[in-house]
């Protein structure tokens, strides 16, 4: 059985320069060191997608016919971030955060200001199975807060060098193959490749 896992989505290389320019226009602190583009596998987790400290209000768009109680629950848990940061999320017809519920798509989100570079008719986040709304509150809290954390620009904390160094690669390959159907390449990208911490 494949359990949906979170996979932060990186922009394609063809969109990176535009995304960097947009991120720097939004927040000058997002300027890349030495004005260069890093490895595409690392781009999505860099401080260069940071919203900034002035605060931000992001609109959230749901697929047509999404149950109003599902929308309310997602916004409830997304807005838990407002207890810790100057951020808020509200439903909008043309939101920057565009949710899909694609079956087999798992859980994923683009990171930080990268969502501003995604075409308006494309999702920026997937919450597989959340459109039916029949899961415990603990799962709503865990997944929705986690994915909206990526939307705020936060990477996976397990990708720090000191944590990755303690992971048995063969055990990781076996585990993620059995629970999520991941290939060795996916495990390498999502679990065993440490972040360049100078860019965090």
Region annotations inferred by a language model:
Residues 1-200:
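Zinc-dependent metalloendopeptidases
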């Amino acid at each position: 059985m494949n359990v949906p896992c979170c996979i932060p989505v990186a922009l394609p290389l063809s969109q990176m320069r535009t995304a960097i320019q947009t991120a720097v226009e939004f927040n000058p602190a997002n300027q890349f060191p030495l004005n260069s583009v890093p490895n595409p596998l690392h781009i999505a987790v860099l401080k260069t997608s940071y919203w900034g400290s002035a605060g931000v209000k992001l609109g959230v768009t749901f697929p047509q016919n999404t149950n109003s109680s599902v929308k309310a629950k997602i916004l409830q848990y997304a807005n838990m971030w407002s207890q810790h940061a100057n951020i808020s999320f509200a439903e909008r017809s043309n939101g920057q955060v565009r949710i899909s519920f694609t079956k087999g798509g798992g859980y994923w989100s683009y990171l930080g200001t990268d969502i501003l570079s995604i075409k308006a008719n494309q999702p920026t986040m997937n919450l597989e199975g959340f459109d039916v709304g029949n899961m415990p509150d603990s799962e709503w809290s865990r997944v929705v807060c986690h994915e909206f954390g990526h939307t705020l620009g936060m990477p996976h904390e397990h990708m720090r060098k000191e944590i990755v160094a303690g992971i048995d690669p063969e055990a990781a390959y076996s585990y993620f193959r059995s629970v999520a159907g991941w290939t060795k390449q996916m495990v390498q990208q999502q679990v065993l490749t440490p972040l360049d911490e100078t860019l965090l």
